[in-house]
Amino acid sequence: MDPLTKGSCGSQLAQTLLWKAKSSLSFGIQPLQTWPTKDPELESQVNLSVSEDLGCRRGDFSRKHYGSVELLISSDADGAIQRAGRFRVENGSTDESAAALPGTWRRTDVHLENPEYHTRWYFKYFLGQVHQNYIGNDAEKSPFFLSVTLSDQNNQRVPQYRAILWRKTGTQKICLPYSPTKTLSVKSILSAMNLDKFEKGPREIFHPEIQKDLLVLEEQEGSVNFKFGVLFAKDGQLTDDEMFSNEIGSEAFQKFLNLLGDTITLKGWTGYRGGLDTKNNTTGINSVYTVYQGHEVMFHVSTMLPYSKENRQQVERKRHIGNDIVTIVFQEGEESSPAFKPSMIRSHFTHIFALVRYDQQNDNYRLKIFSEESVPLFGPPLPSPPVFTDHQEFRDFLLVKLINGEKATLETPTFAQKRRRTLDMLIRSLYQDLMPDLHKNMLNRRSFSDVLPESPKSARKKEEARQAEFVRIGQALKLKSIVRGDAPSSLAASGMCKKEPWEPQCFCCNFPHEAVCADPWGQALLVSTDAGVLLVDDDLPSVPVFDRTLPVKQIHVLETLDLLVLRADKGKDARLFVFRLSAVQKGLDGRQTGRSRSDCRENKLEKTKGCHLYAINTHHSRELRIVVAIRNKLLLITRKPHNKPSGVPGVSLLSPLSESPVEEFQYIREICLCDSPAVMALVDGPTEESDNLICVAYRHQFDVVNESTGEAFRLHHVEANKVNFVAAIDVYEDGEAGLLLCYNYSCIYKKVCPFNGGSFLLQPSASDFQFCWNQAPYAIVCAFPYLLAFTTDSMEIRLVVNGNLVHTAVVPQLQLVASRSDIYFTAATTVHEGSSGGSSKGASAHTSPQTPPARDTPLFPSSLGEGEIQSKNLYKIPLRNLVGRSIERPLKSPLVSKVITPPTSIGLGVAAIPVTHSLSLSRMEIKEIASRTRRELLGLSDDGGTKTEGAPRAKSKTRKRLEESQGGPKPETVRSASSDRIPSGILESPASEANPEGHNHWASSEQDAGVDKEGSPGSGSSPFQLMASSEEDIIDLK
């Protein structure tokens, strides 16, 4: 054991923590953080200060990463203009000098946006499960449907309500917390969805066939499978007639097709066909097909579609590729040759073109994206430069970009209007079919305020029989969707193990206190708890800084200014306190106990008595500004100007420095508001001379207040009966200020226009957008390109530029404690009693989403399992991982690698295995799932008798066919580039027969994690595994 960890929390330990904290306390000199890179020219390590880091976190971003809109004009060989169009052009950064700078956009994380396994709720959580459906009319006499279920969130023992509201404008999905003591009514659910007025109260629908109709409504969100055009263009070809007339492709083009997927024979093809003829070869003999993260993709390849020498325009080829939303154009020739332009293609339907060039000399691909102007922004943004030397990485990036692009196109006005008309027609038709039956059967109508999870007490047996029939029909529908290939099971066939940027690192295990707030101090963390303010670092014993007589509710450590600012809340005696960090450090040397409230009398800012909130400007390049809210009064405080020695920021020439910095602060002005603010944020003006703004939220509105004049302007009015303000976050797009306003389930981005001649301009901007969270958050963190919403039991991650969902992680008892730089949070973990530190990860493995619980496990255990204890760990998400400022992320996560869970209803503990990509296996996998599930539904389970002998024989035949198709048995599973499926042979292997190499992979991960925190119990455990959960991976067909 490290000698520093022995004994009590004495002076030796305090000096150990302070040595880490005071690395920046030599009178405010900020240490530099070194981040390694792979670039040989940058091998000398890039230095980034915390202040630069803060600027990146708080939202200094640019949409230019996603291209700029240009007017593109195409002309023929004679120079005559043919067509013109406005497209957003993405070609990576064009700044040649940016490659050597540390803050450049070198690479991006590749994520599917709005993935179906997170968005198709009805298929995933409702279909085939007991749930309730309601029908009603809103105040405008438009019909709506409501579906409600009570479910366990990803088998994490977190029960919650899920609700879907179906309207002609689209669907709205929310999660509501479950409380065994608090009942929930349909009225309260609709009120949470901001639907409070009705023409008639909703009535429950008991027909089990309603599940089929609601599944059709959900499928209007878009197909889970995709068809993309692939057009081959020779060097110098400038018209679509020339490109479509290429009878055969080049060797490089064939290599590109092999990278995209498998060449399949269309005749007799039973998978997703993408509109191609699979019976009579009228659309060609072969095509290219792949499966990516559960999405089936068919490519309409121009050289594989029928060619006609008599038809110069190649109408048959244009009929397919011209009707694809997304088209890949593979262009041969040097970079200097005439480039492709979208206006060369005559199509009113194609909105996105991906221009691919192959450099044979350097064996790399270059990518350029053209998007029609009306298509919303979508990621991932192209790296700089947009050149891919790793072909597999290029394939993943291209497929994700194309899938996200097609989804974004469906949000354009043209497609959105069509979808709205279709939804309106379907909902009205369904309403007219159901209402006569509902009027006849009034006895089954439940009260508008009935508790949802309870069934009627009368006719119990009849109700149970109805629910059984309801579930049976729903599971049959789910089976049909799977066999048809329309199941949104994206994570059921994940790709290679991938480390996500939001993966947490365990900062402190078994944290025994309730954390209130915190802020980093050097490498340590200053945490306000129920036991006082503690200095925490890893698993070393905590050092007390302030005792419990000073209940701190807000805290800011300003290392560059040698300041500690905190708000101690004790009723009317609440105040702001300011300390010198150097003085706090000096006082801790040799001290066994923290300072009491009486020891801090000299550090009070007296005029802040009774304050309930304060905010500081997060950019410290200018003077420090603090705005304190005392009921409905705002008090602006700044630090007095004083001379500084050159090169040493934050150090006064006053000699000697007083221990308390109270005298250095001055009160500038008071501003009166009409109510007490619940949320407050400071917005920097565009220049030093311009006015700064204060954003405040109270009543039903967000206002901005001019710091100089106190004049208030309405920014946004909230149309809701009840408002829960969450946050106002200042973000800066290309230097221009904007605000993310968060309340209830909503998040709105508003551009803050600068002052003009003393008056504030408020006008709608094309860059404004709005989206809804799935669960009501209590805190929001902006770390471009991500927005992280923290709820009581989950973390929802979206993109700043468009609000699209990229991931939802289940984190029981999640509590955010710090987010000004790195993100720190506490979360509950369950471990076995008596388990050693080295085995804590394995001991808690049964609570991981990777391992589905046994069938006899109760859905919502009221208490912990036998031999289990619950503790809280303190976790850290490094900011530099999120903002993506380095080519390789420098910090090593203790999380184990992502494991692929088989998409079957039987939860097998499969170890980490390589994924094979074989076309025949993917189809066979679906057939085996379907046949196995069909036997279950028909009651033909393999329980003894002659049935038990058939399964092994079929299984052995399957394995034999697979070995023959692959040229004999293989000792290892090899990954190819065409599909992300798991072979059925592996899926049916029990956990004890899993790939031994996969088992070793787990072991090596644990050993690596143990290197960083030797002897720390459970240091590698995580509150949530950032891979597919069992509920996401496993399509439950029981």
Swiss-Prot record:
<feature type="domain" description="Rap-GAP">
    <location>
        <begin position="214"/>
        <end position="430"/>
    </location>
</feature>
<feature type="region of interest" description="Disordered">
    <location>
        <begin position="833"/>
        <end position="863"/>
    </location>
</feature>
<keyword id="KW-0343">GTPase activation</keyword>
<protein>
    <recommendedName>
        <fullName>GTPase-activating Rap/Ran-GAP domain-like protein 3</fullName>
    </recommendedName>
</protein>
<feature type="modified residue" description="Phosphoserine">
    <location>
        <position position="449"/>
    </location>
</feature>
<dbReference type="InterPro" id="IPR035974">
    <property type="entry name" value="Rap/Ran-GAP_sf"/>
</dbReference>
<dbReference type="InterPro" id="IPR001180">
    <property type="entry name" value="CNH_dom"/>
</dbReference>
<dbReference type="InterPro" id="IPR050989">
    <property type="entry name" value="Rap1_Ran_GAP"/>
</dbReference>
<feature type="compositionally biased region" description="Polar residues">
    <location>
        <begin position="1019"/>
        <end position="1028"/>
    </location>
</feature>
<dbReference type="GO" id="GO:0051056">
    <property type="term" value="P:regulation of small GTPase mediated signal transduction"/>
</dbReference>
<feature type="modified residue" description="Phosphoserine">
    <location>
        <position position="68"/>
    </location>
</feature>
<comment type="similarity">
    <text>Belongs to the GARNL3 family.</text>
</comment>
<feature type="modified residue" description="Phosphoserine">
    <location>
        <position position="455"/>
    </location>
</feature>
<dbReference type="Pfam" id="PF00780">
    <property type="entry name" value="CNH"/>
</dbReference>
<keyword id="KW-0597">Phosphoprotein</keyword>
<dbReference type="InterPro" id="IPR000331">
    <property type="entry name" value="Rap/Ran_GAP_dom"/>
</dbReference>
<dbReference type="GO" id="GO:0005096">
    <property type="term" value="F:GTPase activator activity"/>
</dbReference>
<feature type="modified residue" description="Phosphothreonine">
    <location>
        <position position="851"/>
    </location>
</feature>
<feature type="domain" description="CNH">
    <location>
        <begin position="512"/>
        <end position="824"/>
    </location>
</feature>
<dbReference type="Pfam" id="PF02145">
    <property type="entry name" value="Rap_GAP"/>
</dbReference>
<feature type="region of interest" description="Disordered">
    <location>
        <begin position="937"/>
        <end position="1038"/>
    </location>
</feature>
